A protein has these predicted regions:
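Short capping segments at the starts of secondary-structure elements
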Residues: 16-20
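Short, cationic-aromatic polyanion-contact patches
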Residues: 3-6, 57-76
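Short, hydrophobic-biased segments on the C-terminal half of alpha helices
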Residues: 40-44
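Glycine-centered, phosphate/nucleic-acid-interacting loop/turn motifs that mediate DNA/RNA or nucleotide
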Residues: 50
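Short beta-strand "wing" residues that participate in macromolecule-binding interfaces
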Residues: 54
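A short acidic, leucine-rich amphipathic alpha-helix
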Residues: 23-28
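Amphipathic alpha-helical dimerization/coiled-coil segments
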Residues: 75-115
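Pre-recognition alpha-helix immediately N-terminal to the DNA-recognition helix
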Residues: 5-12, 91
Length: 117
């Protein structure tokens, strides 16, 4: 399941720990300027889509991510790679290297990962 940019912002918070609506609002307001109502709307949609779940304790809802982080990241990466580079990993890495976006340490790490079995 592909996530929207807004869904990524919320689920990244929830992968760290379960949060209440007020905690999410505080965590996201500085970065996004979203109101409590905007976050409620997004959370309701995410619950319907199975991205987020919640447990009600009295009047408080505790929201948690319902999807696996690694699977979501892999799906997003694969989609980006296919859409932008036609699935060509070499072209992606070549473009990153040419744009000076990779540090020497990152290049060494990439080399180590490629050489692993």
């Amino acid at each position: 399941m592909r996530l929207t940019d807004s869904e990524w912002k919320i689920v990244n918070c929830l992968w760290k720990k379960p949060m209440t609506l007020m905690e999410l609002t505080r965590a996201l307001y500085a970065k996004t300027g979203w109101s409590k109502q905007t976050i409620i709307t997004l959370l309701n949609r995410m619950v319907e889509k199975g991205i987020v779940t919640f447990v009600q304790e009295g009047r408080t809802k505790w929201f948690s991510a319902a999807i696996d982080r690694t699977e979501a990241e892999l799906e997003e990466t694969t989609s980006f790679l296919d859409k932008v580079y036609g699935g060509n990993v070499g072209l992606l890495i070549s473009n990153l290297k040419c744009s000076d976006k990779l540090t020497k340490e990152q290049l060494e790490e990439l080399k180590r990962i490629i050489e692993e079995d």
